[in-house]
UniProtKB/Swiss-Prot annotation:
Involved in the biosynthesis of lipid A, a phosphorylated glycolipid that anchors the lipopolysaccharide to the outer membrane of the cell. Belongs to the transferase hexapeptide repeat family. LpxA subfamily. It is found in: Cytoplasm. Homotrimer. It catalyses: a (3R)-hydroxyacyl-[ACP] + UDP-N-acetyl-alpha-D-glucosamine = a UDP-3-O-[(3R)-3-hydroxyacyl]-N-acetyl-alpha-D-glucosamine + holo-[ACP]. This is Acyl-[acyl-carrier-protein]--UDP-N-acetylglucosamine O-acyltransferase. GO terms for cellular component: cytoplasm; membrane. Its EC number is 2.3.1.129. It comes from Histophilus somni (strain 2336). CDD domains: LbH_UDP-GlcNAc_AT. Pathway: Glycolipid biosynthesis; lipid IV(A) biosynthesis; lipid IV(A) from (3R)-3-hydroxytetradecanoyl-[acyl-carrier-protein] and UDP-N-acetyl-alpha-D-glucosamine: step 1/6. The keyword Lipid biosynthesis applies.
Amino acid sequence: MIHSTAKIHPSSIIEEGAKIGENVVIGPFCIVGSDVQIGKGTTLHSHVVVKGVTTIGEDNQIFQFASIGEVNQDLKYQGEPTKTIIGHRNRIRESVTIHRGTVQGGGVTRIGDDNLLMINAHIAHDCQIGNRCILANNATLAGHVELGDFVIVGGMSAIHQFVIVGAHVMLGGGSMVSQDVPPYVMAQGNHARPFGVNIEGLKRRGFDKPTLHAIRNVYKLIYRSGKTLEEVIPEIENYAQTESAVSFFLDFFTRSTRGIIR
């Protein structure tokens, strides 16, 4: 079904069954598969391919040669009808690739709202991306990676399968990340190592001084106290009683399976 207000270039191929919403613009030489839904106000600029069971929300901007919902690169994949779900107001720049999920990984590759995926970024099967994240040019996520909200991944960085990156993390360019990264941390290198709290980013997002102070203290407990995580968690719980932002650390540690960067 194609909404009457949608504008579709005659060179594009829209397969029967695709659902194209109100005021959608599809530029030249795009291909949209039969199981694709595109929400109100989204633009496919040109040469965009959207396949598989893919849902794209409202007011997204998708630039030329992006590939969304294509067959993933997991050797176990046998053509199951897994999904790709993209939220609202994302900017997906040139040559970005986003692959559909796998049955073993939950069946969905999911991207939230208000993200910027720069040129040549790759999001593999079953990745879960939060809101307001930035992936700079050539940043690559392997399968099953999770990014919290407000994560910045520097250019030419690579994140290993199953890694969890906490909210408000900033990863410097060229980083190779093979272990989980706690919330609020800045990290860089091959392999990535922590080098402080993302203070400037937190200030821009309205974190007040008492909250920043608590986050810094938790960072010091984790990385400078010489104690194990098991030893510092009760102290983190004490901070969380008065500063709700600290609870992100506790939630993160309950889900972390790969160990944290050191």
